[in-house]
Amino acid sequence: MRFQVYILHLCFFILVVLTYLSQGQSYTTTTTTSTTEQPTFLQKIHETFKKVKENAKIHNLYIFDPPTWIYTTTTEKPVESTENFDITNRQLITVPVRCPPNYDFIKGRCREKIP
């Protein structure tokens, strides 16, 4: 399951890089080159792969696999302060049963008519 999350992160970041390139937006690199040239497409993808690896190593990212428990400072109400509902006095509604054509209602069931 964890491997699938890495693949999803990787696909998402590749999609982001392709979106930036298709829209012609500038993309700043974190490489330590002193040239003023724009990085090539492969360099951008390589940097994105590095970022995906770094993000995958961080276990606090729960985008696709949320934690099962969360810290909270609130307390639950005690049981005696909750309202108890009386369900013994409920009223049931009886609805007539409708049978399809060529069927009769016999002994609580729809049965086919015998000619």
From Swiss-Prot:
- Please state where this protein is localized: Secreted
- Keywords on record: Antibiotic, Antimicrobial, Disulfide bond, Fungicide, Hemostasis impairing toxin, Immunity, Innate immunity, Protease inhibitor, Secreted, Serine protease inhibitor, Signal, Toxin
Any single biological process term in GO: venom-mediated depletion of circulating fibrinogen
Annotated signal sequence is 1-24
Q: Where does the entry say this protein is expressed, by tissue? A: Expressed in the epidermis, fat body and venom gland.
| This protein's GO CC annotations | extracellular region
**Induction conditions:** Up-regulated in the fat body after injection with bacteria (B.thuringiensis, P.larvae or E.coli) or the fungus B.bassiana.
How is activity tied to temperature here? Antibacterial activity against P.aeruginosa is retained between 25 and 90 degrees Celsius.
Provide the propeptide boundaries: 25-90
Q: Which family does it belong to?
A: Belongs to the secapin family.
Q: Which Pfam families match?
A: Secapin (PF17521)
Q: What is this protein called?
A: Secapin
InterPro entries, alphabetized: Secapin (IPR020128)
SS bond list: C99-C110
* Reported function: Serine protease inhibitor which exhibits antifibrinolytic, antielastolytic and antimicrobial activities. Displays antimicrobial activity against bacteria and fungi. Likely functions in the innate immune response to microbial infection and possibly in the venom, as an antifibrinolytic agent.
The coiled-coil segments of this chain are none
Q: Name one GO molecular function term.
A: serine-type endopeptidase inhibitor activity
